[in-house]
Curated annotation (Swiss-Prot):
Positions of the pro-segment in this chain: 20-50
Name of the protein this chain belongs to: Conotoxin Mi5.2
Naturally occurring in which organism (per UniProt): Conus miles (Soldier cone)
Modification after translation, per record: Contains 2 disulfide bonds that can be either 'C1-C3, C2-C4' or 'C1-C4, C2-C3', since these disulfide connectivities have been observed for conotoxins with cysteine framework V (for examples, see AC P0DQQ7 and AC P81755).
Signal peptide per UniProt: 1-19
CC annotations in GO: extracellular region
Location(s) in or outside the cell: Secreted
Amino acid sequence: MRCVPVFIILLLLIPSASSVDVQPLTRDDVPLASFLDDARRTLRSPWMTRRCCPGNFACCGK
C-alpha cells in the first residue's frame, strides 16, 4: 500500500515532463534564423544598388 501514492505521483509527473515538441518537422518548416537572414539579405540589396555610382557599373550588384 505504500507504493500506491508513489505510483500516483509518478503518473502525475510524467505528462508534465514532456516539454518537447512532438510534431515532426516537415519540409515546409523553416527555422527563424534563415528567415531573418533572408530578410537582411533582401533589405541589403536595395541599399547596395543605391550606393552605385552612375559612371561605374562594376560596383553595382555586389
